[in-house]
Amino acid sequence: MSKHVAVLMGGWSSEREISLRSGNACAEALEGEGYRVTRVNVGPDIATVLTELRPDAALNALHGPAGEDGTIQGLLEILKIPYTHSGVLASALAMHKERAKTVMRAAGVSVPEGRVVNRHDAAKSHPLTPPYVVKPIAEGSSMGVIIVRDERSHPPQILASDEWVYGEEVLAETYVAGRELTCAVLGDRALGVTEIKPVSGEWYDFDAKYAGGGSIHVLPADLKLNIYQRVQELALTAHQALGCRGVSRADLRYDDTPGGTGALVVLEVNTQPGMTQTSLVPEIAAHAGQSFGELVRWMVEDASLNR
């Protein structure tokens, strides 16, 4: 009898629609691989749903708070349902950008300088010397990210308004100029490096990530061999330092601008990267010779407890 897999998707975070795309793509691929699949649109009754469903494994296609911060992982541990991706601790650590940086820095991974500040204080005066970036402590998909270019710019006033829905504390980081890179990690190996070039704008914001034609993916990234290998080393080290399991994706910046610093830094590790057939991790896996179906099958067969 084929293995029964519950594909968890949706949820109630700001990344719900992205999660639905990932989940449906994974479910379709798993069905093509011969698994018995139940699509689960996650809501507040998820504990009851999973208790009644009793799948052999859960493929976690959730994004954002409650889906990749250790919450759903803890529930799956309680229910004794093997699941994909990272466990409770690694998920919670990686989701909290500042604590993740502390762990990565201790492991020798270069990260941007920065500090946590109250959002109202950051709206009154510059928390760092511009250029700098302000971002929510625990959001994905570039939600709420603001770049302040120079000292003549006013601090971002939206931080003090009711429109800001990402919590009272924000992370202010030194802006690193240069190229946007990302590296997929699968288990104990780095699969490859992609350079992301936004078609409009200067950085990889939400629209560049998810709008059709919003960015160009250069795979493999056109880098000197030593830099390419260093990106892979940093991604794998960050994955291991945070205790990640299964699939993760490290996002980096490389400053090779004229007169630049040459800095190569890890911005964050995504423990629940996008999983449509055109998402970054599946693209990198395909370039490494692994089809989308083979990728999701590997993830399900890797599912376990105590991750």
Swiss-Prot record:
Gene: ddl
Disulfide bond positions: none
Annotated binding of Mg(2+) 1, by residue: 251, 268
Entries under InterPro entries matching the protein: ATP-grasp, ATP_grasp_subdomain_1, D-Ala_lig_Van_CS, D_ala_D_ala, Dala_Dala_lig_C, Dala_Dala_lig_N, PreATP-grasp_dom_sf
Record family assignment: Belongs to the D-alanine--D-alanine ligase family.
Catalytic reaction equation(s): 2 D-alanine + ATP = D-alanyl-D-alanine + ADP + phosphate + H(+)
Pathway annotation from the record: Cell wall biogenesis; peptidoglycan biosynthesis
Uppermost EC category: ligase
A Gene Ontology cellular-component term: cytoplasm
Taxonomic lineage: Bacteria, Pseudomonadati, Pseudomonadota, Alphaproteobacteria, Hyphomicrobiales
GO molecular function (one): metal ion binding
Subcellular location(s) per record: Cytoplasm
Protein name: D-alanine--D-alanine ligase
Sequence ranges assigned to domain ATP-grasp in this UniProt record: 101-301
Known cofactor(s): Mg(2+); Mn(2+)
Name of a matching Pfam family: Dala_Dala_lig_C
Keywords: ATP-binding, Cell shape, Cell wall biogenesis/degradation, Cytoplasm, Ligase, Magnesium, Manganese, Metal-binding, Nucleotide-binding, Peptidoglycan synthesis
EC number of the protein: 6.3.2.4
